[in-house]
From Swiss-Prot:
It comes from Trichormus variabilis (strain ATCC 29413 / PCC 7937). The keyword Lipid metabolism does not apply. PANTHER family: URIDYLATE KINASE, URIDYLATE KINASE PUMPKIN, CHLOROPLASTIC. CDD domains: AAK_UMPK-PyrH-Ec. Its main location: cytoplasm. The keyword Cytoplasm applies. This is Uridylate kinase. Homohexamer. Pathway: Pyrimidine metabolism; CTP biosynthesis via de novo pathway; UDP from UMP (UMPK route): step 1/1.
Length: 242
C-alpha cells in the first residue's frame, strides 16, 4: 500500500489524551491512538511525536492566576513527559519500539534530546516521542512541533485535534462556520486562524513544512492522512484558499 510520506511529525494535544474525562489521561483513548500509530508504522512510515500537557497542567492558565510564568511553563513541560511516557508504554505493549527524548535531562526516565540519535531511531523503525517541549519557557508545544519537524526533516506536521479542520469561526459557537480545505501560511497569520501559534506557523513557512489539521477522534484518520486521503485542512506555501 503506497503512502504519501516517508517521515511525519504527529502533534498531539494533551487534551486529546483525556477523552471525555475532563482531566488527566484516559487509558482507552491512549490505547486507541497507539493502535493507530502501530498501523501506520506497519506501512513503513517513520513517525515522531510531540505531545502537549494541557490535560494535566496549563502553564498559561496558571500564570494568569498569578504563578511565575517561567515556573508554570516548566511544570507544563513535566506534564508533557508524563503523557509521553504513558503513550510509550501503550505503544510498547503492542510491540512498537518507542523512545522518549526530553529537552530537559531526565536520565532515569528518558533519553536526552539528541537530533542525530532521534533520526537514527526513526530510520530503524522506532517511534520517537519528544517530551518537555523545547526545554524553554514561553514557547508552546506547537512551536516545539515545528522546530522538531525542521530538525528531523519531517515532510509534514499532522496536528491531530478534536475538530475536523480549520474554520473561519468557532464551529461550536457559529453553526454556519465554514471549514477550509486548504490555506496558505500567510492567510493563517493574517486572519489569526489559530491553527498553531504565530511562531510555529512562521517556522513552518520558513522551512516549507505543510501542516495537516484533522480530527483525531475519528478512528483511522492518522492512517488516512498518511495515505493522502482528503481529510481536514492542509496549510502550506503553495496551497490555494478553499
Amino acid at each position: 500500500m503506497g503512502t504519501n510520506y516517508r517521515r511525519v511529525l504527529l502533534k498531539l494535544s494533551g487534551e486529546a489524551l483525556m477523552g471525555n474525562m475532563g482531566y488527566g489521561i484516559d487509558p482507552e483513548v491512549v490505547k486507541e491512538i497507539a493502535q493507530e500509530i502501530a498501523e501506520v508504522i506497519a506501512t513503513g512510515v517513520q513517525i515522531a511525536i510531540v505531545v502537549g500537557g494541557g490535560n494535566i497542567f496549563r502553564g498559561v492558565k496558571a500564570a494568569s492566576a498569578g504563578m511565575d510564568r517561567a515556573t508554570a511553563d516548566y511544570i507544563g513541560m513535566i506534564a508533557t513527559v508524563m503523557n509521553a511516557m504513558t503513550l510509550q508504554d501503550s505503544l510498547e505493549r503492542i510491540g512498537v519500539q518507542t523512545r522518549v527524548q526530553t529537552a530537559i535531562a531526565m536520565q532515569e526516565l528518558a533519553e536526552p534530546y539528541i537530533r542525530r540519535r532521534a533520526i537514527r531511531h526513526l530510520e530503524k523503525g522506532r517511534v520517537v516521542i519528544f517530551g518537555a517541549g523545547s526545554g524553554n519557557p514561553f514557547f508552546t508545544t506547537d512551536t516545539t512541533a515545528a522546530l522538531r519537524a525542521a530538525e528531523i526533516d519531517a515532510e509534514v506536521i499532522f496536528k491531530a485535534t478534536k475538530v475536523d479542520g480549520v474554520y473561519d469561526a468557532d464551529p461550536e459557537v457559529y453553526p454556519n462556520a465554514k471549514r477550509y480545505n486548504s490555506l496558505t501560511y500567510a492567510h493563517v497569520l493574517a486572519q489569526d486562524l489559530r491553527v498553531m501559534d504565530s511562531t510555529a506557523i512562521a517556522l513552518c513557512k520558513e522551512n516549507n513544512i505543510p501542516i495537516l489539521v484533522f480530527d483525531l477522534t475519528t478512528r483511522g484518520n492518522i492512517r488516512r492522512a498518511v495515505l493522502g486521503e482528503s481529510i481536514g485542512t492542509l496549510v502550506g506555501g503553495s496551497c490555494e484558499i478553499s
